[in-house]
Amino acid sequence: MNFEAGYHNGISGTLNSWGGEQHVISRLVEQIRKYKPKVIVTHDINGEYGHPTHRTVPYVVINAVKAAGDKSKYKSSCNEYGICKVKKLYLHMYSKHTVNMSAYSKSAKELDYKTPFSMACVGFDKHYSQHNGWSMHSKAVKKYPSYKYGLYYTRVGYDKKKNDFFENIKNS
């Protein structure tokens, strides 16, 4: 989606530097409608350590998830892709309807028997602009465990097992 990286002045400053709130939401609505995800997982509503971009992302995602299922919103992408009613939205560190993704440290066949955490480390290693003294093993990163989430929105009911983002979602 090619938005300017950097440390902006709060949510409104970030949105302004990205072309305005409606522009940003419309771009994400278009992607949701195009790819039709069943589940979306995003940043902590407080931006983990308060980073303005990290705070802006869940704000945009929450609004885009609502709009993507509404045919009266962003009609151009609706005409091209139809609507998409996302089934579940998880926020990192969200305190309600918590999910502990303990499988984060277990190898997964879908990842060539690597752990999701090891794959996150590979991704972080590519995110050069964020290194500046950070590592996936630092105390600061461990303060915001990457396996703790909360179910912010659901169309399919609340999780009972609380260990699978796709719980209650039938294959389709």
How should each PLM-predicted stretch be described?
Residues 1-74:
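Active-site beta-strand->loop->alpha-helix modules in alpha/beta enzyme cores, enriched
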Residues 67-172:
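The feature marks non-catalytic terminal segments
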